[in-house]
Swiss-Prot record:
Single strand-specific metallo-endoribonuclease involved in late-stage 70S ribosome quality control and in maturation of the 3' terminus of the 16S rRNA. GO terms for cellular component: cytoplasm. Its EC number is 3.1.-.-. GO terms for molecular function: metalloendopeptidase activity; RNA endonuclease activity; zinc ion binding. This is Endoribonuclease YbeY. Disulfide bonds: none annotated. It is found in: Cytoplasm. The lineage of its organism: Bacteria, Pseudomonadati, Chlorobiota, Chlorobiia, Chlorobiales. HAMAP family: Endoribonucl_YbeY (MF_00009). SUPFAM superfamilies: Metalloproteases ('zincins'), catalytic domain (SSF55486). Keywords: Cytoplasm, Endonuclease, Hydrolase, Metal-binding, Nuclease, Ribosome biogenesis, rRNA processing, Zinc. Its main location: cytoplasm. Belongs to the endoribonuclease YbeY family. The gene is ybeY. Binds 1 zinc ion.
Length: 144
């Protein structure tokens, strides 16, 4: 299967919705899937990856690695469900919607969007809102 989802936590996820979301974001942006691994993990694991590969000693919501430069995406992303839960409380949003937002954010990173500048961050936020509205309202589902 070109997109594999792994959940290393005890939290239940609506994996089919998350998979459809990633594939649809890529397709809508003109990209396909060669091979993508999506790992939903805890705070400890994402902090270790952040420290080992990016030299940042803290937990974050998502880390994305892209291994191809063509329109067929080969890559992986890690999402910390613990950080998602913390952010959902902090921003007073539903955990499921925050999880969907960060999954969309990760898909956007895979295709080359960057949030390291003000303009890039704004562009990503607009794309996130577009896709978040598309999936949360059109499907009337959340990824739980």
């Amino acid at each position: 299967m070109p997109l594999q989802i792994f959940n290393t936590t005890r939290k239940e996820l609506h994996e089919e919705l998350l998979e459809r979301t990633v594939i649809d974001v890529l397709d809508s942006e003109g990209f396909g899937v060669e091979s993508i691994v999506a790992v939903y993990c805890g705070k400890k694991m994402i902090r270790k990856i952040n420290r080992e590969f990016l030299q940042h000693d803290y937990a974050t919501d998502t880390i994305t690695f892209r291994y191809s430069d063509n329109r067929e995406i080969d890559g992986e992303f890690y999402i910390s469900l613990d950080v998602i839960e913390e952010n959902a409380r902090r921003f007073e949003v539903d955990f499921k919607l925050e999880l969907l937002r960060v999954t969309i954010h990760s898909a956007l990173h895979l295709i080359g969007y960057d949030d390291q500048t003000v303009d890039g961050r704004l562009q990503m936020q607009q794309k996130e809102e577009f896709y978040l509205n598309r999936y949360s309202e059109a499907n009337n589902q959340t990824p739980s």
